[in-house]
UniProtKB/Swiss-Prot annotation:
CDD domains: UBA_EF-Ts. Belongs to the EF-Ts family. This is Elongation factor Ts. SUPFAM superfamilies: Elongation factor Ts (EF-Ts), dimerisation domain (SSF54713), UBA-like (SSF46934). Residues 80-83 are annotated as: Involved in Mg(2+) ion dislocation from EF-Tu. It comes from Pectobacterium atrosepticum (strain SCRI 1043 / ATCC BAA-672) (Erwinia carotovora subsp. atroseptica). Keywords: Cytoplasm, Elongation factor, Protein biosynthesis. One of its GO terms (cellular component) is cytoplasm. InterPro entries: EF-Ts_dimer_sf (IPR036402), Transl_elong_EFTs/EF1B (IPR001816), Transl_elong_EFTs/EF1B_dimer (IPR014039), Transl_elong_Ts_CS (IPR018101), UBA-like_sf (IPR009060). HAMAP family: EF_Ts (MF_00050). PROSITE patterns: EF_TS_2.
Length: 283
């Protein structure tokens, strides 16, 4: 009988996101063969969707697809990078994406209802919680998409641009994370909040209020440029702004969408040493 070490249990947990006792049991049954343990766990129907529903699904994939003048971006979550690369999970995400494009579905609850049966079956097969998290779409004269691996996806809609330019703009959005298209699009609420922050910083430096306010006015112009697409230095040629690039091509960006896997989801960090200690007390 092979020794089932804590490090072996930890590795299996990291690769499958299964519970510690479940991993230990699988390794015992597989006589310490981690690959066989994974295979047996994936074949087992004991891992049910109901048991995984409360687990945080913060990994996964971003998918994009363009169909003529219509494009969709989708996020489907799982719990680990291991499952995010699984063929069955990828096929499920692709199927959801195709349905969203074909039906022009932008209500994620509609997609969830349509694919709930398949989702539950996949959870039981793979052993992780899976969630169709969000979907959005763009329509435009010229559309471009870019995917940085499977974790970041971007759609860009433009006028007067060719496909190559829109592709480069999508790559820029992926890298530089703008929040708005143009400086004038930055909401009054965002501007007011940043103004107060910058004014407080300026006042703390000992400047009189009148001088501090003038300093902040200059900083605010810089701020709105930094958070807007057209105000940012173009990643492929930082000597010019995206706005200048568009002007050179007599083009305009009407909208963009950027998704990154797990944005806004708080991952639960597990203290492995504490969990080992707890498990040893139970045995």
């Amino acid at each position: 009988m092979a020794e089932i070490t804590a490090s072996l249990v930890k590795e299996l947990r990291e690769r499958t996101a299964a519970g510690m006792m479940e991993c230990k049991k699988a390794l015992v049954e597989a006589n310490g063969d981690i690959e066989l343990a994974i295979e047996n766990m994936r074949k087992s129907g004991a891992i049910k969707a109901a048991k995984k529903a409360g687990n945080v699904a913060a990994d996964g994939v971003i998918k994009t697809k363009i169909d003529g003048n219509y494009a969709v971006i989708l996020e489907v979550n799982c719990q680990t990078d291991f499952v995010a690369k699984d063929g069955g999970f990828q096929a499920f995400a692709d199927k959801v994406l195709d349905a969203a494009v074909a039906g022009k579905i932008t209500d994620v609850d509609v997609l969830k209802a349509q694919f709930e049966e398949e989702r539950v079956a996949l959870v039981a097969k793979i052993g992780e919680n899976i969630n169709i998290r969000r979907v959005s779409a763009l329509e435009g004269e010229v559309l471009g998409n870019y995917q940085h691996g499977a974790r970041i996806g971007v759609l860009v809609a433009a006028k007067g641009a060719d496909e190559e330019l829109v592709k480069h703009l999508a790559m820029h959005v992926a890298a530089s994370k703008p929040e708005f298209v143009k400086p004038e699009d930055v909401s009054a609420e965002v501007v007011a909040k940043e103004y107060q922050v910058q004014l407080e910083i300026a006042m703390q430096s000992g400047k009189p209020k009148e001088i501090a306010e003038k300093m902040v006015e200059g900083r605010m112009k810089k701020f709105t440029g930094e958070v807007s697409l057209t105000g940012q230095p173009f990643v492929m040629d930082p000597a010019k702004s995206v706005g200048q690039l568009l002007k050179e091509h007599n083009a305009d960006v009407t909208n963009f969408i950027r998704f990154e896997v797990g944005e806004g989801i708080e991952k639960v960090e597990t203290d492995f040493a504490a969990e080992v200690a707890a498990m040893s007390k139970q045995s």
